[in-house]
UniProtKB/Swiss-Prot annotation:
GO terms for cellular component: endoplasmic reticulum membrane. It is a multi-pass membrane protein. InterPro entries: CER1-like_C, Fatty_acid_hydroxylase, Sterol_Desaturase_Related. This is Very-long-chain aldehyde decarbonylase GL1-4. It comes from the Eukaryota. Expressed ubiquitously at low levels, with higher accumulation in developing panicles, shoots and flag leaves. Identified as LOC_Os02g40780 in PubMed:17138699. It is an enzyme of class 4 (lyase). GO terms for molecular function: aldehyde oxygenase (deformylating) activity; iron ion binding; oxidoreductase activity.
Amino acid sequence: MATRPGPLTEWPWHRLGNFKYVVMAPVVAHGARRVMRNGWGDLDIAFSLILPSLLLRMIHNQIWISLSRYQTARSKHRIVDRGIEFDQVDRERGWDDQILFNGLVFYAGYLAMPSVRRMPVWRTDGAVVTALVHTGPVEFLYYWFHRALHHHFLYSRYHSHHHASIVTEPITSVIHPFAEHVVYFILFAIPILSTIYLGNVSAMGIVGYIAYIDFMNNMGHCNFELVPEWIFQIFPPLKYLIYTPSFHSLHHTQFRTNYSLFMPFYDYIYNTMDKSSDELYESSLKGTEETPDLVHLTHMTNLQSAYHLRIGIASIASKPYSDSAWYMWTLWPLAWLSMVLAWIYGSSAFVVERIKLNKMKMQTWALPRYNFQYGLTWEREPINDLIEKAILDADMKGVKVISLGLLNQAKQLNGNGELFRQKYPKLGVRIIDGSGLATAVVLKSIPSDAKKVFLRTGTSKIARAIAIALCDRGVQVIMNEKEVYHMLKSQIPENRASYLKLSSDNVPQLWIVHNIDDNEQKMAPKGTIFIPISQFPLKKLRKDCTYMSTPAMRIPEEMKNIHSCENWLPRRVMSAWHIAGILHALEGWNMHECGDEMMDIEKSWSAAIRHGFLPLTKA
């Protein structure tokens, strides 16, 4: 929102929220009526292109979003080395509004101008007219309109909304108040109306011109330099006809320079080109290699989780993951296809996120594998090969710590990472499974006045550490798994072993659990508090019970470039396993935490609090 919003700031369908696509219902109804009356042959090319062209524009923009986020996480060609936060993602959530607006106006134009219904697929002379009119009147008028928008009166009421994003993403290009978009549409309609008036309009000419506008808008706001220098060396005048991402980036950081739409020519002739444009272009193109201090290695969970990655769909990634959202299921076919392609061609981890905490740099890498694949016996070796490759790549790059997230540290897969430590005893990178901090977070979430807990966790080292710590506190630990009970009892000091009890009766209302099924949840007494020790949340089956979060903590304000949620966790909340790796790097601890090794619980907790991580309240 602008600092002092003026008239026509909001889109007309703003109050519809996610149901805004209903505004295209008249177009759908019109087409359906014609097909039912006269068959598919009754649809002319002009009408037939309205809805498909809107869909293609959305796909085009999404490709740019994913590409930009991927490159700014890993590339040395980043232009503005600052992060974006959730407020920018929320502000730019409605990037498709202008596509809907264009669709409605094109439909109105189709109804109002019968001549366009007979237009051919392509006219070369029409394309030439479009290019000339854009280069002249459109670029000229846009330049002066843009300069007017930077006058205090219009800037405070309209254009400041766009400039709230100093670090741009491709979709920043279309984040403007409704009134601005009306003017932009009028400007971009000039070449199209010119071809209609001259009688050389064509379907592909219109679609191609709009695709050009989208491409240049997205490229100019992508925040990484990709225009190669050799293009300008081969044809020097091109420097005045096509801008670069670094050229337009200066407009967002300096505000009073580089006003041109896509052609810097007008900034040159009116002396508004930023003097550092060439220097920034060259330095961004050259780039600087960067080595992260920490890598967190994760993976996809279920099919739709690919959309929840930071490089997926921005608005979905900015919220805690939920597979119950109806719109996620509409994307299922594409999710299934991406899973198959990842399974066949995914041969290494890929970078999905880049975070900074003061001077420490972190990256999140994801393996192209899903939860169900970790349960397949024949997939264990290939998955371990992927993890091993990621560890060796991190070691070669000089990364200090690599933390294993989700199932990448499963005991049955690689012994909590011990497999790699044994195989490569001279590793420089420290392998962390985060068990020490995860244990600490669980223990700190148990009420201090608790006298009894019910433990249903299996035999993981976190479960053992929790049982031992609770017995040391004098808390009675009740279990109903005989085999696990005897295994744990043998590891508890004799003077504390009496606090461990095997029983199925008088089960308390405080349950510490790993992964329990629906039947076990139904057995819990009313008012039970479930505290999970797993990285995966429990299914919230009971409304009369309380479900705590998986082990996690709130991150400090100093941690920057956080604009996506870690799986199902709330905003600016990070799993204990991820945080453990950060602490390892911050503190310079030299030990591995994998296999049976575990960091001191209190030491891990104290370090987390000291560095600004805060405990969570209940989920």
